[in-house]
Amino acid sequence: IAGKEAYLQGTVYCATKAAVDHLTKAMRMDLLPFGICVSAIAPGAAETEFSLVRFKGDSDQASAVYQGFTPLDAKDIADAVHFIVTRPPHVSIHDLVIMPAAQASATLFKKD
């Protein structure tokens, strides 16, 4: 989601994700004459090793990121990829934003 909206202390990360978003849009235009569809998936909070790396291996701090709500997992994203690649040839999914039900924006969560 960082490529769709900026957030505090995410300057470089959000900027690079926004660059990927525009690269994807440009590739979509460049590859259109060849019949190649280009899709982008923008996931919200997904429980991956990202938080562990972000907190330099501190597993307690990394786990705290996901406390109080159910984050996305790899299967959720894989299901989205499967949905995109199984569309009929006349259908192109350009952008798919996937968020946990408890997440309304990059920084707004409903936690238990």
Task: Show where each model-derived region lies.
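Active-site segment of SDR-like NAD(P)-dependent oxidoreductases
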Residues: 1-5, 45
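Active-site helix of classical SDR
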Residues: 16
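C-terminal helical subdomain
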Residues: 40-41, 60-106
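Short, flexible, mixed-charge acidic loops at enzyme active sites
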Residues: 51-60, 110-112
